[in-house]
Amino acid sequence: MSIARRTTLSKFLIEQQRETNNLPADLRLLIEVVARACKAISYNVSKGALGEALGTAGSENVQGEVQKKLDILSNEILLDANEWGGNLAAMASEEMETFFPIPANYPRGEYLLVFDPLDGSSNIDVNVSIGTIFSVLRCPDGKQATEESFLQPGTQQVAAGYAVYGPQTVFVLTTGNGVNCFTLDREVGSWVLTQSNMQIPADTREYAINASNARHWYDPVKRYVDELNAGKDGPRGDNFNMRWIASMVSDVHRILNRGGVFMYPADKRTPDRPGKLRLMYEANPMSFIVEQAGGAATTGTQRIMEVQPTGLHQRVPVFLGSKNEVDRVTGYHQEKQ
């Protein structure tokens, strides 16, 4: 690709702003700041043990999960990058119990930013791809945010994206007008458009699920996975392969590129907890991206983006990816209702 012909993230967003007239300047600037923060996170991740940021921090987040040093650092990078720009009313993060209002000494904007600063952090110390997930909403109360301001269904998202820190660092984005992927050119520090209008194949022969939990699954999930595992001898009449990275951004990025279905269901171990993944900053942004790429995303019983949130850290079951497979496993759940 000729350097002169490259489309950077900034150029892409400005062109989108001109062509669609539905990408406000403040939203464009906010996306650029998030992308810049992801570059800083990528740099710290890539240093590994040389940066003395591996290992646990000796603390837990609001979910009771042990925090890694890079979890905390990534959270601080996103907060520091976004608090002063005047585009946001408030932020919320997996790593914080309550929301983060923009300090009074900085101007406030009309948007809310919600993020998982470092998804898949159990993989940090073993050099497996991890990432950042984010979602942008409008603040319904103008520039004065409360926790209730964040509790909007995913259909109200105005932008969502993720970064993957792997062999390449990529930034995947939707503003409701398709899905595009940008690759970080480390030599010049720019995000360069490398995939346009990404589309998930409707059919697939790959699935992603943590099979070690099989004994705890409810019947619809067991039925679906058993059919896949039966291969050509089973009711599907075809062989399927399982892929599981234990990093949602990595699994979803693979599905976005070559199809597949990602499943993180509720199970019998914790019947009072509907799933593990968080709605606001994991399931909703990924569902927005997947749907914009022609896929589907459900809880097994309803479209994820139509779930009305009741809390910042609410959890939901997740089934997303190639539409025909998501429709099938969703149908099995609906039969049991």
Curated annotation (Swiss-Prot):
Pathway recorded for this protein: Carbohydrate biosynthesis; gluconeogenesis
This entry's Enzyme Commission designation comes to 3.1.3.11
Which Pfam families does the annotation name? FBPase, FBPase_C
Q: Which reaction does it catalyse?
A: beta-D-fructose 1,6-bisphosphate + H2O = beta-D-fructose 6-phosphate + phosphate
Residues reported in the UniProt entry to bind substrate: 119-122, 210, 276
Q: Which domain of life is it from?
A: Bacteria
Main subcellular localization, coarse class? cytoplasm
Gene3D superfamilies of this UniProt entry? 3.40.190.80, Fructose-1,6-Bisphosphatase, subunit A, domain 1 (3.30.540.10)
Cofactors demanded by this protein = Mg(2+)
Q: Which GO terms describe its molecular function?
A: fructose 1,6-bisphosphate 1-phosphatase activity; magnesium ion binding
- Which GO terms are recorded in the biological process aspect for this UniProt protein? fructose 1,6-bisphosphate metabolic process; fructose 6-phosphate metabolic process; fructose metabolic process; gluconeogenesis; sucrose biosynthetic process
Q: Which InterPro entries match?
A: FBPase_C_dom, FBPase_class-1, FBPase_N, FBPtase
Keyword match Magnesium: yes
According to its UniProt record, this protein's enzyme class is hydrolase
Keywords carried by this UniProt record: Carbohydrate metabolism, Cytoplasm, Hydrolase, Magnesium, Metal-binding
The entry marks the following residues as binding Mg(2+) 1, namely 94, 116, 118
Q: Which GO terms describe its cellular component?
A: cytosol
Q: Which residues bind Mg(2+) 2?
A: 116, 119, 282
Provide the cofactor note recorded for this chain's UniProt entry.
Answer: Binds 2 magnesium ions per subunit.
* Record NCBIfam families: PRK09293.1-1 (NF006778), PRK09293.1-3 (NF006779), PRK09293.1-4 (NF006780)
Which family, according to the similarity comment? Belongs to the FBPase class 1 family.
User: How does it associate, per the subunit comment?
Assistant: Homotetramer.
Database matches in PANTHER family: FRUCTOSE-1,6-BISPHOSPHATASE-RELATED, SEDOHEPTULOSE-1,7-BISPHOSPHATASE, CHLOROPLASTIC
What this protein is called in its record is: Fructose-1,6-bisphosphatase class 1
